[in-house]
Structure formats: structure tokens, C-alpha cells
Amino acid sequence: MSIQITIDGKTLTTEEGRTLVDVAAENGVYIPTLCYLKDKPCLGTCRVCSVKVNGNVAAACTVRVSKGLNVEVNDPELVDMRKALVEFLFAEGNHNCPSCEKSGRCQLQAVGYEVDMMVSRFPYRFPVRVVDHASEKIWLERDRCIFCQRCVEFIRDKASGRKIFSISHRGPESRIEIDAELANAMPPEQVKEAVAICPVGTILEKRVGYDDPIGRRKYEIQSVRARALEGEDK
């Protein structure tokens, strides 16, 4: 059913029940995301897509549009909130962009540029997390993980449907885990899918590195904003 909603004072016509992030993008309004993937079940873990819906802060990827919805995206308070959330993620992990293999292809890095982050306002933690290289095909850089849970939910063993990745422990001790036995059975295309689905440089394919020349990397060719507005990258 066609309905009308308002985004930043502009009245739009869309279909009831669609995801707010997608509706906004189709109407030229960019809302940054890190855990959301178009046409996949919503995770709502990163909160980087926070907006106001009828006066209340909500994660846009979790909101299904309905008649009369009033959405604020570019309010200064919200813009700073989203920037702060990105800064938190940079401060919590070890994101050394110049030396990271994912630089230029990293969604966190690209979103950082979009929210005008230069340096985090929060003290950096520099956590020490053990690298997991038990798998024959995947190198797991735990200290870069932002716990978006994309890999946990969407990368599964082809035969059994079991999860290949998981998160163990709680709070500051949380860390990403990999089932080496299941990972060793992953076909090459699924390994590449796992690397691509990770928004940072946590999941890396062994024996493949720095194969995209500077100037030809994903977000150098087209920004994360442009990709999102075209529905190609969330």
C-alpha cells in the first residue's frame, strides 16, 4: 500500500513496510550503516544509522515505514551522534588504516570520511587480541572487529547450515571466533564472500594481499555514499 512519510521536512511517497534506510537512499538521503546489508535480515548492531522517528532516536535499519512517519536525519545533534558512534568504533579497536590490507575497501574507513571524522574524541584503547590463523584459508585479525555480526549470521556452512563464525565472551573480553574445520571446507567463492561482507579488515584471505592498487580500490572508485544511494552498497 502506498503511504506518505516525511524525511527532513520533505514529503515522500513509498510502500508501507519497507526499510527506512532503503527508502531514504532511493530519495537521495544518505544514512550511514555498517551492519546493514540490503535484502538481508536486519541486525541493528552498530547503531551508526541512528535517526529520529517521530521524535525518538531509532536505528533506521530496524524501522519499517508506516503512514505519517516523521523522520529527522540531518539534524545537527543526530549528525554528531552518528559521528561519535563511528569514533567509538575507531577508539575501541586497532584500526591502523595505512598498513591495513582492507584500506580503500574498508566500509568503516569510508564511513569515517563521510561523517568528517579526523581523529576520535575518545581515548584509544589499543586492545590486545590474539590473531587466529588456525584456518587454512582465513586469517582472523580480531583487534579490528566491530562486532557487526554480519559474518556470524550470513556466512554458514553450505552442507549443514552451521555458523562458521561466532562471538565468544562478553563485554571488553568479547572476541570473534572461527570454526577452523568448517572454514577449511569453505569453497573459494565463499571465502571471498566472507572477506567482502566484513566491513573492516578482520576477515582476510590467506595468500592474497594488497591486490588492489591504490587509486583502484573499492571506495576510491566510488564513495560509500554514492554506492548506498544507488542501492549497491549499504
UniProtKB/Swiss-Prot annotation:
It is found in: Cytoplasm. It holds the Pfam family Fer4_Nqo3. One of its GO terms (biological process) is ATP synthesis coupled electron transport. It catalyses: H2 + NAD(+) = NADH + H(+). Its cofactor is [2Fe-2S] cluster; [4Fe-4S] cluster. [2Fe-2S] cluster binds at residues 35, 46, 49, 61. Residues 2-77 form the 2Fe-2S ferredoxin-type domain. GO terms for molecular function: 2 iron, 2 sulfur cluster binding; 4 iron, 4 sulfur cluster binding; hydrogen dehydrogenase activity; metal ion binding; NADH dehydrogenase (ubiquinone) activity. [4Fe-4S] cluster 2 binds at residues 145, 148, 151, 198. Its main location: cytoplasm. The keyword ATP-binding does not apply. Tetramer of an alpha and a gamma subunits (flavin-containing dimer), and a delta and a nickel-containing beta subunits (hydrogenase dimer). It is an enzyme of class 1 (oxidoreductase). SMART domains: NADH-G_4Fe-4S_3 (SM00929). Residues 77-116 form the 4Fe-4S His(Cys)3-ligated-type domain. This is NAD-reducing hydrogenase HoxS subunit gamma. Subunits alpha and gamma of HoxS constitute an NADH--oxidoreductase. Belongs to the complex I 75 kDa subunit family. Keywords: 2Fe-2S, 4Fe-4S, Cytoplasm, Flavoprotein, FMN, Iron, Iron-sulfur, Metal-binding, NAD, Oxidoreductase, Plasmid. InterPro entries: 2Fe-2S_ferredoxin-like_sf, 2Fe-2S_ferredoxin-type, NAD-red_Hydgase_HoxS_gsu, NADH_UbQ_OxRdtase_75kDa_su_CS, NADH_UbQ_OxRdtase_ferredoxin, NADH_UbQ_OxRdtase_Gsu_4Fe4S-bd. [4Fe-4S] cluster 1 binds at residues 95, 97, 100, 106. Binds 1 [2Fe-2S] cluster. Binds 2 [4Fe-4S] clusters per subunit. The keyword Flavoprotein applies.
